[in-house]
Amino acid sequence: EAKKPCVHIEREDDPAKQVRRYGFTAGLKISVLSNFEHLYIYDTSYPVEQNDTRLKAIVREYKYTDYEDAAEELLEYLGKESVYSGHFDEVWSEIEANVNHKSVDELFLQQINNWRLMLGKEILNCNPEIEMEELGDVVQSYINKILFLRVCEDRNIETYQSLLQIADHNSYQELIAKFKAADSRYNSGLFEEKLSAEIIGNVSSSFWSIIRELYFPQSPYSFAVLSSDILGKIYEIFLSQRLAVVDGQLSIVNKPENEDRDIVTTPNFIVREILRQTMRDNLAHLTDEQILSLKCADIACGSGAFLLETFQILCDALVDFYTVNDKSKLIQTDVNTFKLKFEIKRNVLKSCIYGVDKDFNAVEACKFGLLLKLLEGEDDSTIASFHPVLPNLDDNIFYGNSLLESSDVPDNQVEEINPFDFGERKFHYIIGNPPYMKTEDIKVFTPKEHKLYPKRYKSAYKQYDKYFLFVERAFKLLKKDGAMGYIVPSKFMKVGAGRELRNYISSNKSIKAITSFGAHQIFSDKSTYSCIIILQNKENDSFTYSEVDSLAKWKVRDLTSFSENKRNISHLGKETWVLCSDRLQSILNHISTQSLPLGEIVGDDYIFNGIQTSANKEYIFQPESEDRQYYYFKYNKQLYQIEKKITKPYFKTVSGVDSLNTYRTFKPNARVIFPYKRRTDGKLDVIKLSTIQRKFPYFYNYLRVIKSELDRPDRDIKPAPTTANEWHRFGRHQSLEACEIAEKIIVGVLAQENKYAVDTNGT
C-alpha cells in the first residue's frame, strides 16, 4: 500500500490498520506499507482490533537511508526472485503457520454461522411452521443480499455506509426499499423477495446486528479485497452444514453425508494447475471469437471454485488478445496494464461458464460468487450504463444430479433424485474436484441412486468410488477434442474396483497427462494420495506422466521439483497401472526380471484383504477394561460388556499411523466381534441368533441395541442372506477362514514404504 509522502505513516495508526485489514482479508502472510520515506512490513495473519497502534504486528521497518545497506535483506524478504524461487515461503514460514491457524475464512465462517443462528432463531420464533429446508434457504438468501451490498460499498458501486445508516435508523421499511432498489438495478435473482416484509418487519434487530458487524471496528475485513475464491472456500464449508432443531434448540449440524468426515476445499494452486494443463495453454492460440465460443463446465461445482478461476483465465486470455489486436475493447488502468470492459466480462460469464450441483444451496452460492467475481475491479462509473447490471445465471448454473438423467430414474423417484438432463449439451472443457464417496457410503446416503448407477456406468464395478462415475460422465460430455481435468485419489490405478474405469480410460486412449503427488498431502488435515488426471476426447498414442518430488518447489513451477516422462498408452489396460519415473522404471524392470510375483510363490488364494464387516462402528471396539470372561467397551457413549469368546484380535490404524515394522511381530490394538463358527470341513458359518441368545447373552443384548444399524435395507451383505435372521452377518464372507490363520504377513493398503509385519495372534 503506497501512500503519498505527506501521509505520516511513521506516527499515524490508520494507514497501518488499513494495510493490515487488506492483507488479512486477502489471506496474505505479510503486507507492505510505504510513503517512500519509510517502509514497514506487517504481519497480516491475524485480525485488526480497534485500539491497535501502528506498531502492532510490525515485523520490519526501514527508512530510505537504510535501503542501500539493507538491499540484500529487502530482496530476500520482498524480491521477485525470492517469490519465484519459493524462498519467500521459507522466509515467512512462521507467519504462514499463523495464516493457517487464524485464517480469514475460518473467522468469517464462524461469523456467518453466528448470523445463521441469530437470523434463523428469530424467523423460527415468528414462523414456527416453517420447514427447516426452507428456513435454511431464506437465511442464506438474506445473508447473501446483505453481504453483496456491503461488498459493493467497498468497491464504490454502492454508497459507503448506506446499510449502516439504515441500521442506525432502525428502519425495516428502508431496508426493504434498499432490497427492492437493488433488485431493480442488478436483476440477477439475488434480490428476489423471500417473505421479505413478513421477515424483515419481525426480525429487524437481527439485520441491524449483522449489518453493524460488517463495518470496522466490529469487522476486521476490507470487502474491497475480499476475493471470490476466499469467499468460495468459506461457502464450501458453509454448504456442508445445515440448520436443525436439536434438543429443542436451533443448531448448526453437518449434513448427513458429511457427519463422519471432514469437508476439504481444493487449494487454489491445484485449481490453477488443473486449468493450466486442461485449457490455459491452448487459449494463447485462439481468437477472441473462439475464446467467447468456449463452453466450460464443472458438473459438481459446489460453491464454484473452479468456475471462478476459469472465468478469470478466459478474461485474462481476452486481455492478452486485445492488447495485441484491438485495445479499443480494453480499459487502461496503468502503464501497460489493461482490463476488459464490463460488457465483455459479462459476455464471458453468460456464454462460457456452466455448472451443475445436486445441492440447491451450492447452486445459489456458486451464482453469488460468480456475480461478485464479475464485479471485481469495477466501480459505479464502469457499470452505470448497464441496466440491469448483472446477468441472470439460471441458464448457466443448474440444480440437479449430474450423474443421472430422467430416463435413468423411475417416475416415482424423480423428485427425490432430481436427475439433470444435459440433452445435446457438450463442453470444450470440464474441470473440477468430483465428490469422493465409497460404495458403502453411497448405499447409506443415496440407496436409490446406488441401484441405478450400474445400469449407466461401466465404472460402477464392485466397491467403486463415486469419483469413478464422475470421470466417466465428464468424458462422455466432452466435445470432440475437448479435455477434462480432475484431481482424484490415485487408488483407481491400483485397486481391483478400479478395473473397469482403467479399462474405459485406456481403451479410449484418452489420457493426456497424469501428475502424481505420491505421499505429498494436498488437502489440509486429510490423508489422501492424489493425482491430477487430464483426459481428451481424442485418441492419443502417448501421455505425460509426472511425479512431484518437492511440493513447495512444484507450486512455483521449479522444473527440478518433478520428473516428466512420456508413456505409451498401449501399455495400459484394465489391470493395475504401475507408473513411475524413468529412473525408478529401470529399477522396477530389473527387479521384475529377478523376481516372481508373490501369488506364484504362496498361491493367489493366500493373498487376501482383511475382513469386511460393513459395520465397523458396531463390530470393532477398543476395550475400556476386561476381566477373565468379559470385555467392557463403549458404543455411542454407553458402556457394554461382551463375552471374550465371541471376539477376535483386530488391528486398526489410528490417525493414519499404522505402527507396522518389517519382520517384526506386532500387537493387535482392538477387538472385533466375530459371530462365526467353524464347520468340520474348515468353512465358517454365521452363528444362529438362537445360539447366540443361549451361549452369549451379553452379545445378544448388544445385538438388540445395534439391530437397527445392522438390519438397514441399504446395508449390503453378500452373498445375500437366505433367511430374515442373518442380519448380523458381515458385509462380505471372503477371507473369513484365511483370517484365522495363526501366522500371517500383514502389509497396509497403499503403504508409503515397505512394511511387512508378522502376525502371530490370529488377528
What feature does the model see in each segment?
Residues E37, L75-C315, C352-A362, G400-E405, ...:
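Preference for the N-terminal adenyl/adenosyl cofactor-binding alpha/beta module
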Residues N51, T159-D168, L286-S293, L314-V348, ...:
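Flexible phosphate/Mg2+-sensing switch loops adjacent to catalytic phosphate-binding sites
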Residues H38, L239, C301, F360, ...:
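Short, glycine-/Ser/Thr-/acidic-enriched flexible segments
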Residues E1-C6, Y22:
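Conserved catalytic cores of phosphodiester-cleaving nucleases, focusing on short active-site segments
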Residues S303-L308, Q312-C315, K367-L371, N701, ...:
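Phosphate-binding glycine-rich loops of NTP-binding sites
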Residues E12-L33, H38-E96, N100, N156-E158, ...:
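Signature of N6-adenine DNA methyltransferases within the class I
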Residues E129, F517-I522, R732-Q734:
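Short, solvent-exposed loop/turn elements at beta->coil junctions and helix N-caps
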Residues K4, I30, F468, F475-K476, ...:
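Polybasic, glycine- and aromatic-enriched phosphate-binding surface used to engage nucleic acids
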